[in-house]
Amino acid sequence: MVEEGGVVVNQGGDQEVVDLPPGFRFHPTDEEIITHYLKEKVFNIRFTAAAIGQADLNKNEPWDLPKIAKMGEKEFYFFCQRDRKYPTGMRTNRATVSGYWKATGKDKEIFRGKGCLVGMKKTLVFYTGRAPKGEKTNWVMHEYRLDGKYSYHNLPKTARDEWVVCRVFHKNAPSTTITTTKQLSRIDSLDNIDHLLDFSSLPPLIDPGFLGQPGPSFSGARQQHDLKPVLHHPTTAPVDNTYLPTQALNFPYHSVHNSGSDFGYGAGSGNNNKGMIKLEHSLVSVSQETGLSSDVNTTATPEISSYPMMMNPAMMDGSKSACDGLDDLIFWEDLYTS
């Protein structure tokens, strides 16, 4: 018994199957199959290998070959002799009881070293039934034969038995995710993706606690709480423009000019009467519970709602924030009392 290429081979009679250590796999290259196995078998018919069995592919179906293989998980190797379809012909018989092997593609040349041709590899696919109406399967076979330097014509007559090495394996079916990827790539509108989104799992866009409340809406209760000291102390408390309502207040006296501003000031307006928003004392009052209210104020104490108000037009031209200085808010108590 001799060890060649890491595989235990038996050049005598009976073959002793040797298990490979964990982590080792029998995965020879095309050139190794030709040089270390097929050539040895052709020159010595008694040659056997621990990882390569011997089988007649015309008498065995491809799904039965793994059972008689010496070694292999996904690929199974066998020494085989070609069966001539006709005694005087050169065509190979590739039929079995259930179907036949059909060659596909072009034979591949196998070289050793720098351009030394030593063999050829043929690819075949198994079909069930009979040609030409056979049904293709996923069973594939690579058939290795000697050629070039090791051509049968260069061998003695005693070595001209047409031995080949066959590697048989089952090719996995195509993945079904390709269809899904193509379908997703064709989605180009919102109408096509509505069925892919689960809207029930999305959070609400509007806080239900603010639905149904009158007056302008703010981003949260914290902003309402921070707004109260600003209204009571307009000249000292810092103000962020995020506290301003995004929609116009429903003022009883609201003049609209060419600028389209919610406060009714034109870009070049010099008329204070046109640029004034008169706030009646019943318009807006500050409430400790709700922040803003439209309740009628019957008290005599002057509040923000009890003063007419005018804003400087420079606040609305975009160069100055509407809240950069509340000093621009001019309270006209005399106009109210008149």
UniProtKB/Swiss-Prot annotation:
Membrane-traversing stretches: none
GO-annotated molecular function: DNA-binding transcription factor activity; transcription cis-regulatory region binding
Residue ranges the UniProt entry marks as DNA-binding: 118-177
Compartments in which it is found: Nucleus
Assigned GO CC terms: nucleus
A Pfam short name: NAM
Matching InterPro entries: NAC-dom (IPR003441), NAC_dom_sf (IPR036093)
Keywords on record: Activator, DNA-binding, Nucleus, Transcription, Transcription regulation
Domain NAC: 20-171
GO BP terms in the entry: positive regulation of chlorophyll catabolic process; positive regulation of leaf senescence
PANTHER family tied to this protein: NAC DOMAIN-CONTAINING PROTEIN 46, PROTEIN CUP-SHAPED COTYLEDON 2-RELATED
Subunit structure: Interacts with RCD1.
Protein role: Transcriptional activator that acts as a positive regulator of leaf senescence. Activates NYC1, SGR1, SGR2 and PAO, which are genes involved in chlorophyll catabolic processes. Activates senescence-associated genes, such as RNS1, SAG12 and SAG13.
Other comment: Plants overexpressing NAC046 exhibit early-senescence phenotype and reduced chlorophyll content. Plants silencing NAC046 exhibit delayed-senescence phenotype and increased chlorophyll content.
Notes concerning its domains: The NAC domain includes a DNA binding domain and a dimerization domain.
Protein name: NAC domain-containing protein 46
Species of origin: Arabidopsis thaliana
